[in-house]
């Protein structure tokens, strides 16, 4: 009986693994289409963002120009900090979580890439992804990566929990 159950679990695992590989291949095909290719390459210059996350950001956000500032986009994702204030009493809260939960989850997972490595360090994988982009895009992404890593480590030094530092 145990052997049959284990065999059933293994067959299910193999089936799901094959399905994930098919979806990943399809995502790679979509990302190489002309209308997505350039944007996916640019977003890939950031730490933690690979094809799936970049394509999801592009497709689900649509036109990034509709957001005048980054804080408006953060509110759209539910990553903006909440606040409960009255008169002189100001209470700052965590992220609102009122927004696109799928993109928020993807960006929080992508932020895990910031947690690894020293400030200013580039992995071989990141260098490879940045290779085909312009110097302006790479400089912008490097500046953002350095800022995010510095901010993460600063939060940790000041005693914030890791998950709070990652989301910030």
Task: Indicate residue ranges for each PLM-predicted region.
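A detector of single, family-specific signature residues
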Residues: 1-168
